[in-house]
Amino acid sequence: MLPLLQLVPAKLLNSSCSLEKTLQCSCSFHGIPTPSVQWWMGGVPVGVDGMDGSLQVTSTMLGPWANSTISLTEEPEMGMRLLCEGKNQNGTHALSILLMSRKSSLAAQAFVKGLIQGAIYAGIVIALLFLCLLPLIVKHIRKKQAKKAAAIRAKKSSKVRASQELEMSLKPEEPGKPVVATFSESRILEKQDKRAS
C-alpha cells in the first residue's frame, strides 16, 4: 500500500525581477499537487509558453515545483500591474508587481535634483543680497539711534533749563546785597539810576 501524499496549498517561495535589455520577472511556487502558474498583465491573463509581441512567458514544472518567467520586450505603461499567480486545488498564492517606466523615474530624479539645486542657489542669492544690504541696514539703524539720542538730549536740556528758570524765579532777592555786574552792565545801571532821580 502506498502512503498518502500530504496535500500542500500553492505557496510562492521565490520571486525576482531584473532589467537588462528586457524586463524579466520570475516566480517559483511549491505545492502538492504541483501548482499551475498564470501571469496577468493589467488584469488580462497572459498565455503560458506563448508569445504576445511584447510578452514572452516560459514555465517549467518539476515535482512539486513550478517556475515561470515573463519577459517584457517593450517598456510598460506607467503604473501597469503584473501579477504572478500560483494555484492548486488546495489554495492560491499571488505576487503583484507595480511596473514603472524608466523614463518616469528619470524625470522624477531630474525634478528632485533641479529642486535641490534651485534651493541651494536661492540660499546663495539671499545670502549675497543680505551681505550687500548689510551696510545700508547698519547705516539706517545708526541714524535712527542718533535721532533718538538727540531727541532725548533736547528733552533733557529743556527740562534742565526749565528747572533752572524755576529756581531763579523762586529765589528771593536779598536787599542790600551787592550785585556783581560787568562794566557795560554797570554803566547801564548808572544811567538808569540817574534817570530815576
Swiss-Prot record:
| Chain intervals with Basic and acidic residues compositional bias | 162-176
Superkingdom, natural source: Eukaryota
Where are its TM segments located? 118-138
Give the chief site where it resides: membrane
Q: How does it sit in the membrane?
A: Single-pass membrane protein
Q: Does the keyword Nucleotide-binding apply?
A: no
Q: Where is this region: Disordered?
A: 160-179
Tell me if Ligase is a UniProt keyword of this record.
Answer: no
Keywords, A to Z? Membrane, Transmembrane, Transmembrane helix
Q: List the disulfide bonds.
A: none
Q: Quote the protein name from its UniProt record.
A: SIGLEC family-like protein 1
Provenance organism:
Homo sapiens
Upper taxonomic lineage = Eukaryota, Metazoa, Chordata, Craniata, Vertebrata
Gene this protein is translated from: SIGLECL1
